[in-house]
A protein has these predicted regions:
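Cysteine-dependent PTP/DSP-like catalytic domain, specifically the C-terminal lobe
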Residues: 258-272
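Core catalytic lobe of class I
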Residues: 2-3, 7-261
Length: 272
């Protein structure tokens, strides 16, 4: 029903399945249209361009970038349900004469309406080796909520079943949660690798691909079955794959036609 409404206002998608619609368009236009039609999103998961001049992005002036990103985040706020979450994967920016690794969080702090509920550290393990710095091995996932006192969070869905730490009850007895350990706010999940003889099985031609294990945890932990999930920079389509695998609906915006083709090929191989 929700996807039918989306198609009514946005038109024919670039690609669709029973539970996913992908639009080849600027996400700002898409978010504005969703707001105008009164549709609400249960959870948004995304990783916008970091503005560090990578091959797939145009570098902006810092203030311009902050305004651009804040306008998108506030647009997402306007279309989020009262119990909804926004999971934002961010990296670091270099500010000339001030800092080499400044968290994007600091730039957004006073300019967005969401409540920052928690910062998740994604420790991806392998990466670039540095000689004059500590080698970077993590990125952040900022967990924003609309209502600080009431939000969707399914801890039991994302517990680590292989680790069961005992805890003490009021009567002094020790017991373990049979579903496993709380995964904590540090997630050890390997990144998608590339290169001859070392490329991940899920690797596509997208240069900044989310690993399925990462987004799978986000989808299960911060949304409910049949919820509507948005990824405004859907890139390689990992969010859509995880929505299909976990019984969620997904809207994805991607401005690159080449990446939309990657998504089409990938979703054609994914069971719906």
């Amino acid at each position: 029903m929700k996807l039918t409404k989306i198609k009514t206002v946005l038109g024919t998608p670039y690609f669709e399945t029973e539970s996913v619609v992908i639009y080849n368009m600027d996400c700002k236009e898409g978010i504005r249209t969703i707001k105008d039609c009164g549709l609400k999103i249960d959870c948004t998961i995304t990783s916008p361009p970091y503005n560090i001049g990578k091959e797939y992005e145009d570098k902006m002036h810092l203030v311009e970038y902050r305004k651009w990103l804040a306008s998108i985040v506030n647009g997402i706020y306007d279309i989020t349900t009262d119990y909804g979450s926004f999971l934002l994967n961010v990296g670091y920016l270099e500010i000339p004469h001030r800092g080499k690794a400044v968290p994007i969080t600091y730039l957004l702090w006073e300019h967005i309406n969401f409540y920052l509920n928690q910062e998740i550290v994604w420790n991806y393990g392998a990466g670039v080796a540095c000689k004059k710095l500590l080698s970077p091995r993590n990125e952040k996932i900022l967990w924003y909520v609309k209502n600080a006192n009431a939000y969707t969070f399914n801890l039991d869905e994302i517990r680590d079943p292989d680790v069961k730490y005992p805890f003490q009850k009021k009567n002094g007895k020790l017991r373990c949660n049979t579903l496993g350990k709380n995964p904590s706010d540090v997630w050890q999940i390997a990144k998608v690798t590339s290169g001859e003889n070392r490329a991940s099985a899920e690797r596509t031609d997208h240069p900044a691909q989310f690993p399925i294990d990462l987004i799978d945890r986000v989808v299960k932990g911060f949304s409910n079955p049949d919820d509507l999930i948005l990824d405004p920079f859907i890139g390689s389509g990992t969010t859509a794959v995880c929505c299909i695998n976990n019984g969620r609906k997904c809207i994805g915006f991607e401005i690159s036609t080449d990446y939309c083709e990657i998504i089409r090929e990938r979703l054609n191989q994914t069971k719906n």
